[in-house]
Amino acid sequence: MPLNVHPDIISLSPYVPGKPIEELQRELGLARIIKLASNENPLGPSMKARAALSQGAETLHRYPDGGAFRLREALADRWKVTPDQIILGNGSDEILGLLARTFLAPGDEAIMADQTFVIYKMEVTAAHGRPVIVPLKQWRHDLQAMAGAITDRTKLLFLCNPNNPTGTMVSASEVERLLLRVPAHTVVVFDEAYFEYVRSQQFPDSMAYVKQGRNVIVLRTFSKIYGLAGLRIGYGVTTAEITNFLNRVRPPFNVNSLAQRAALAALGDDEHVARSRAVNAAGMEQMVKGLAALGFAPIPSEANFVYVDIGRDGRQVFEAMLREGVIVRHIEGRMVRVTIGMEEENREFLAALKRVVHPALSAG
């Protein structure tokens, strides 16, 4: 008997993550692998977070705090909001799913860019909503076109800032103009996973929009600069009214106790965050200069990765780099995304890329 699967689910393709280090080691028998595919912090978690994990092992037989009281209190204090304005997720990805399930009825619309975080489209489709795709303009969100795409059925508008995979950002003045055109029935989702890496002074203060009581939610994560990707924990800051509805569809105990402990400790380690920013800034300069020396011009990035036109089939370059023991992320066509690593990792990546794209020069 055939399965009776909803057509929207049939239309989806499973998410394909960056290739795991262990998998490549098994396939090629390589001892050393450099992974620059998933925008992880090369420093890893702070020592405070590691210590918190060790201490948390003693209570693993107990269910976690379902309301994440201590972590929500700390986040509320950090962003000067109330704890009932904070929602925790098993990664910020989970909160994207909660938003889709909460706000989308079948056929309702959600606006997003064409080259942005793929999970938006997946979650909207899984909730039987309709993704409305607006092309990027010069690698950046076209906020004017996104505002023009809003209809009576638009319930969500996703703004990944800085954008993944391009690394580009939209400014405060651009966002202000967008918000003037957003009706009350549309919730704007500021997905700011890479917020802590931003250097531009023009970046919008999205938390201010929350405090103004607007229908917005700001998503942040502990997976990137805090180095806790393996624990899956992220959070949203919004109005108490919106969190109230999101909590109605949030699974119980969705954030495990180790993740809560580590995130709380990481949040209090500003020194580790500062060091991570410094490593990224130095690595970004090294990467941009190294790519330029090879004839490539990556798109200016405000995140912890670069997006670059590699000048040839990106899939072939990706596969050739795997054989060199380097994992990057092929996005589409000639475009490849590369995470900023430690100095030695960046140097080895650039040397491997030179061997792949300029073999004659490398041999010489």
Task: Show which residues each predicted segment covers.
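Short acidic capping loops at alpha-helix termini that bridge into adjacent secondary structure
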Residues: 32, 82-86, 106-109, 153, ...
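Phosphate-binding glycine-rich loop
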Residues: 61-109, 127
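PLP-dependent aminotransferase class I/II
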Residues: 67, 215-299
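PLP-dependent aminotransferase-like
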Residues: 102-159
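PLP-dependent enzyme catalytic core of the Aspartate aminotransferase-like
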Residues: 173, 319-364
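Conserved PLP-binding catalytic core of the aspartate aminotransferase-like
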Residues: 280-281, 289-324, 340
